[in-house]
Amino acid sequence: MDLFGKKVLVIGMGKSGISSARFLKKHGAYVVAFDEKREDEMKTQQKETIRKFADELYFNDLPDAVVDTSDMVVISPGVPLTKRYITLAHKRGIEVIGEIELAYRFCRSKNIVAITGTNGKTTTTTLVGEILKKVFDNVIVCGNIGFPFIDYVESSTDDTIFVIEISSFQLETIKYFKPMVGCILNITPDHLNRHMNMDNYIRAKMRIFENIDQEGYSVLNMDNSITRDLIGCAKGTVITFSKNESDTQNSVFVDGDFIYRNFLGKVEKVMRKDDIFMPGEHNLENTLAAIGCVLPFEIQPSIIEKTLKEFKGVEHRIEFVREINGVRFYNDSKGTNTDASSKALNSFEVPIILIAGGYDKGESFEKFAKLISQKVKKVFLLGQTKQKIADQLQKIGYLNFEFVEDLKEAVKKSFEIAKEGDVVLLSPACASWDMFESYEQRGRLFKQYVNEL
């Protein structure tokens, strides 16, 4: 693919947008950058970085003429395909792709493990990377995890193994992207404000299998009703994982106290499930998925076992922060939907003080409210969805909730009522964009406020 002299419009100036602009400029493209923010809303340092790589820069509104004269459009994951300028580009026959697709077209290595799903993506992606790094020298973990794929393609070789976390938004804009291993961890309602309905969301996730050939592998969760039904759409060799016993070839499963793998007709014991360092049933699921993703690499069970005994999880996912007077504080800012936060609540058998609420993605809180009533002694609600969650709690007669203005107030009040043995858990069940730049910022502020107590 020759970019020299091509006019490429890059839409969205977050991490992947800036990385795409940098790459395109280096390869001789004429780069036009656009972000919907007003110029005064963008940080000075960010603007200065963009100007290094952009020949033209637009804020807030994009003239149709700019789209009309572009040879290609590269969009960031946060940009909906329904935007006027995207629709116009399609109408004009201009190719619209994302950073993942752009990176793939310049990637020399075909050793790509791509992982998607509603929940568990970051933990599983990181874990797969840790297992592979025990055996292979050149393993790169990137993607939606916070490190754009495009930043690493030029330094890669034929032997590089990429482990890429991919969101449904990123999968919407692939065309030729073909992983060696594609995995869907689970699918539950999420991002319905963007995808409009579950069918569209499922179709976006399924695209991870779209270009896999006979030499590739599709990894699926048999314990999730939606992903189980996708087995007929999976391509290449299908690998399944389940917390239940299985006699299926090419599978990872639990039998009694042990995790087993069945690959190429050979059944092997991997480890005791209770030896996994990370707590919670959801992390058992993430572990099984990770073992499934590395099956094609034929790694010794002892190496996998050692990694899983040592792996402590990822930041913002049921992350232990501090214990004060017998009260433990956990940061689960990555709980951005009710399924993820439900799993966090179910990870504890002690009284929980919950901090929840945030940006409204259109999800129902009915089931989540019932679980709160069973597991939570008090919940502090904040953000755009606080009234929506409160309404569901009131419907079932649960009144132990309180509205707070911000996260600092929530932490302070939680500590004031907590008793020895309690857990204070930030698990919002919502995205962060109403009050914070990202779930990472929300989680780090939570940790800051806890450490200031």
From Swiss-Prot:
Cellular component annotations (GO), alphabetically ordered: cytoplasm
DNA repair in keyword set: no
Functional pathway: Cell wall biogenesis; peptidoglycan biosynthesis
Primary location class: cytoplasm
A GO BP entry: cell wall organization
Protein localization: Cytoplasm
EC number: 6.3.2.9
GO molecular function: ATP binding; UDP-N-acetylmuramoylalanine-D-glutamate ligase activity
InterPro entries in the record: Mur-like_cat_sf (IPR036565), Mur_ligase_C (IPR004101), Mur_ligase_C_dom_sf (IPR036615), Mur_ligase_cen (IPR013221), MurD (IPR005762)
Pfam families on file: Mur_ligase_C, Mur_ligase_M, MurD-like_N
Alphabetized UniProt keyword annotations: ATP-binding, Cell cycle, Cell division, Cell shape, Cell wall biogenesis/degradation, Cytoplasm, Ligase, Nucleotide-binding, Peptidoglycan synthesis
Enzyme class: ligase
Catalytic activity: UDP-N-acetyl-alpha-D-muramoyl-L-alanine + D-glutamate + ATP = UDP-N-acetyl-alpha-D-muramoyl-L-alanyl-D-glutamate + ADP + phosphate + H(+)
Binding, ATP: 117-123
Biological role stated in the UniProt entry: Cell wall formation. Catalyzes the addition of glutamate to the nucleotide precursor UDP-N-acetylmuramoyl-L-alanine (UMA).
HAMAP family hit by this protein: MurD
Family of this protein: Belongs to the MurCDEF family.
PANTHER family: UDP-N-ACETYLMURAMOYLALANINE--D-GLUTAMATE LIGASE (PTHR43692:SF1)
Name the UniProt record assigns to this protein: UDP-N-acetylmuramoylalanine--D-glutamate ligase
Organism in which the protein naturally occurs: Caldicellulosiruptor saccharolyticus (strain ATCC 43494 / DSM 8903 / Tp8T 6331)
